[in-house]
Amino acid sequence: MKNPKLTVIRSLLVATSLGLLLAAGQPQGLAQAPAARPAKAFKYERLDKNNAAVLLVDHQSGLISLVQDFSPSEFKNSVLALADLAKYFKLPVILTTSFEQGPNGPLVPELKELFPNAPYIARPGNINAWDNEDFVKAVKATGKKQLIIAGVVTEVCVAFPALSALEEDYEVFVVTDASGTFNETTQQAAWSRMESAGAQLMSWFGVACELHRDWRNDIEGLGALFSKHIPNYRNLMTSYDAIQAAQKPAPKSK
């Protein structure tokens, strides 16, 4: 006959042993999780007209005919708006083309006319502009660390140099409406790839406003630029001009 006291003692020993084994198997610190680290504060990196350069990549007559994510007139207007704002803010501009003698065609003439003295790098075959030594030298010669990039096509001629510049610690701002490609699917994929790598996606209008900072710096000048490329903006400037004229004191009669 079994001794009841021995049975109870054995049960207690087994329970104690199991408890020790379970405790030993737990990761250290499980009972008290470490305090969560505070999230890193977001830093708003603004465009600075004193530290920015504009790279216009492969806006060539042949390549532009491939752009389908914007209408031809809409796209051309955005490209020229970016060019005009670069001139307005006196930003260094670098023009580059790829394989001009092939189907890509020459640089669109309006850009060459706007920037006759800008560095013009006709790449003999480099698909990625950053693979061209002369192009990179021209970028570095500006002394600017913020690069405003636009081009055709978005997933190649914009994305490749944008990613390369990010790798070399430049701040990259991609002008989405002055960059074009075959369709919205490739557009979105290219934007996602660049944004996830650290590029900021902006419109030409956003670029202009961020560079300008304050309307009081020059109302008429920036307003004229906007009116040239945004038809409805002319209504705002017409209204503003009328108010300004009405507020002027009448000339004194002699």
Predicted regions and their residues:
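A contiguous pocket-lining binding segment that forms or flanks enzyme active sites
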Residues: 146-204
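Short, surface-exposed connector motifs at secondary-structure boundaries
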Residues: 87-94, 116-119, 141-147, 170-175
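Glycine-rich oxoanion-binding loops at beta->alpha junctions
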Residues: 120-140
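Bacterial N-terminal signal peptides
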Residues: 11-23
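N-terminal secretory signal peptides that target proteins for export/translocation
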Residues: 1-7
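Short, acidic/turn-prone active-site loops that include or flank metal/cofactor-
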Residues: 124-127, 177-180, 207
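Active-site acidic carboxylates
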Residues: 29-120, 124-125, 188-195, 200, ...
